[in-house]
């Protein structure tokens, strides 16, 4: 399992229950490893990203954890998409087909955590401004220390 160096938390205690299964799934798929920089409640552009990752190839990913409120999660994930290489929603139940269509059209991935997490829709790889990507990568590295 990935070592955090501190106990990860979220602002919402109920949403925090989505975090351990998400991290376990990411590790089991080898999407994260010991060199991955992982932040929760990462401050970025005047908002907080629930979980932000920086991989060894400087690829970034943002995850919005939500219970039920798919519309709000999609809105936040779309903001994240402007700065992160991949943007995901992690939710506790299967969204309606129309909601999945909205996510798909906008390049946002969906992970459903019920008995075990599963990827319902893969996030598209975004083309990020090199200036934004460099700034985000630097901030993720600095915030780690």
Which residue ranges define each predicted feature?
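Short secondary-structure boundary/capping elements
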Residues: 43-46, 68-72
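Nucleic-acid nuclease catalytic cores
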Residues: 66-70, 83-116
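Basic, amphipathic alpha-helical patches used to engage nucleic acids or provide basic targeting signals
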Residues: 72-82
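Conserved catalytic cores of phosphodiester-cleaving nucleases, focusing on short active-site segments
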Residues: 22, 51-53, 57-69
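Short amphipathic alpha-helical segments and helix-helix/interface helices
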Residues: 23, 77, 99-100
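Acidic-basic catalytic patches of nuclease active cores, encompassing PD-(D/E)XK
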Residues: 1-44, 54
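Non-catalytic C-terminal interaction segments of nucleic acid-processing enzymes
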Residues: 1-6, 24-27, 106-145
